[in-house]
A protein has these predicted regions:
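Short linear capping/connector segments at secondary-structure termini
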Residues: 17-19, 119-124, 179-183
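Conserved S-adenosyl-L-methionine
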Residues: 33, 39-109, 196-235, 243-249
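Short amphipathic alpha-helical segments, especially helix-boundary/capping motifs
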Residues: 10-16, 58-59, 80, 112-118
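Short, charged/polar micro-motifs that form catalytic or ligand-binding hotspots
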Residues: 23, 27, 74, 128, ...
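S-adenosyl-L-methionine
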Residues: 1-46
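SAM-dependent nucleic-acid methyltransferase catalytic core
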Residues: 135-246
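Hydrophobic (often cysteine-bearing) scaffold residues that line and stabilize catalytic clefts
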Residues: 29, 33, 80, 134, ...
Length: 249
């Protein structure tokens, strides 16, 4: 019997989101497509309230908010709660301008001999993820972002989003399929040993530009990202919803 060839619908996967503004800010492979949610929400009444009990990267919440709806989503992972809040928040022109002005300040911190990096996270065999030069750069950059003086903490959020993009981009992890693997360490080196800081700075600068390019695209609706266990929804949300969209397994 001839095998049936099934064409992959990339437009229903995370790849469709890559260049769609805030949806592409930070890629996590299992994320599903914006198109999927838009099609499901399309027939809702104007005052509909949307629930996603498994937020993930908050694709549902952001889609609903962009279409003017009220959305709530639940996530047990604190980092994903932070990411969902960052993606669905409003950013003022002042916040965006302040953020863009920090590139030079961060560069000065990175090049300062007195700059002290944050401690690297206690990951087993961390050099399997980042080479020593990259790890040193990332630890100094994180310290700079943490300590830079800002009047608006939303600016720090944008700086951290760009940091996450750079951290993933410069890692040895390969995200081209669902089960993560590692790149060949011999082919990993993007840059030579000399002036690696300057090259890494360029990567971060480009990632920050990408984040800022859609930061002003504030959603017209609202989204609440709740840190909690979706098995106990009745303790986390106390009102009814018109549509429930759950993440795919």
């Amino acid at each position: 019997m001839a095998q049936l060839q099934v064409k992959q619908r990339i437009d229903y996967t995370h790849r469709h989101n890559t260049f769609l503004g805030r949806h592409g800010w930070l890629r996590l492979t299992p994320a599903y497509s914006v198109k999927t949610v838009d099609e499901l929400i399309g027939s809702c009444a104007e005052d509909a309230q949307v629930l996603d009990p498994f937020a993930g990267t908050s694709t549902t919440a952001l889609c609903a908010a962009y279409q003017g709806y009220k959305a709530a989503t639940v996530e047990i992972n604190p980092f994903l709660v932070w990411l969902g809040d960052a993606k669905t928040s409003h950013y003022s022109p002042r916040s965006i301008k302040t953020t863009s002005e920090q590139v030079f300040s961060l560069s000065q911190i990175l090049r300062s001999e007195d700059a002290s990096p944050v401690l690297a996270p206690p990951i087993h065999n961390i050099n399997r993820w980042w080479n020593p030069q990259t790890l040193s750069f990332l630890c100094k950059l994180k310290k700079g972002i943490d300590e830079i003086k800002l009047d608006d903490e939303r600016s720090r959020t944008l700086l951290l989003l760009a940091f996450c993009r750079t951290m993933m981009k410069l890692s040895k992890a390969d995200f081209n399929h669902q089960s993560m693997s590692f790149k060949d360490s011999d082919s990993f080196e993007f840059f030579g040993m000399e002036n690696h800081t300057g090259e890494y700075e360029k990567v971060y600068s480009e990632d920050l530009k990408f984040v800022l390019s859609s930061a002003s695209d504030n959603p017209g609706g609202s989204a609440e990202v709740i840190n909690g266990d979706a098995r106990f929804l009745n303790k986390l949300v106390n009102h009814k919803f018109d549509l429930v969209i759950t993440s795919p397994p």
